[in-house]
Design a protein with these regions (language model features):
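A structural signal for isolated positions on well-ordered beta-strands in alpha/beta enzyme cores
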Residues: 5, 36-38, 76
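Histidine-anchored nucleotide/phosphate-binding helix
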Residues: 17-32, 37
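C-terminal structural segments of small proteins and small subunits
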Residues: 85-111
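A glycine-rich helix N-cap at a beta->alpha junction
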Residues: 53-84
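Short, active-site-adjacent cap segments at secondary-structure transitions
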Residues: 44-47, 83-85
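Cofactor-binding loop segments of dinucleotide-utilizing enzymes, especially the Rossmann-like FAD-
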Residues: 9, 40-42, 80
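Short glycine-enriched, charge-decorated loop/helix-capping segments at active-site entrances
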Residues: 50-55, 91-94
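Short, glycine-rich nucleotide/cofactor-binding loops
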Residues: 4-19, 47-52
């Protein structure tokens, strides 16, 4: 199976770039790729299950949550970035786990 790695470092509220990143993630999964998603810096906010989206805005967290449950998707939130933003196990999406930058670099070598 072909592998694809993507790093999300922007918050879900950062304009159209995060939506396009999710479009890319969805396309890779639909084409049968095994996808590794690394959430870094403000990107860890995609993993917050209790995040509220303002009325009238697209809920990218729910969209990411749905994509991250795909059997070929491995989603990892940077533990250090998560701690800096108050993200703990109790507020983490069930389909996302904590990990370190080493996992990102390993994923790049196999993608």
């Amino acid at each position: 199976m072909k592998r694809f790695s993507i790093l999300l470092s922007m918050s879900p509220d950062s304009g159209t770039v995060p939506a396009r990143a999710l479009d890319t993630l969805e396309a890779a999964l639909s084409k049968g790729y095994a996808v590794f998603v690394f959430l870094y810096e403000d990107g860890v906010l995609f993993a917050r299950k209790d995040r509220d989206t303002p009325q009238g805005e697209i809920d990218l967290v729910s969209r990411f949550s749905s994509l991250s449950t795909h059997p070929n998707c491995d989603s990892v939130a940077c533990i250090t970035a998560s701690e800096r933003r108050g993200l703990r196990n109790s507020s983490l999406l069930a389909s996302v786990r904590f990990g370190g930058l080493g996992e990102w670099t390993e994923s790049l070598s196999s993608s």
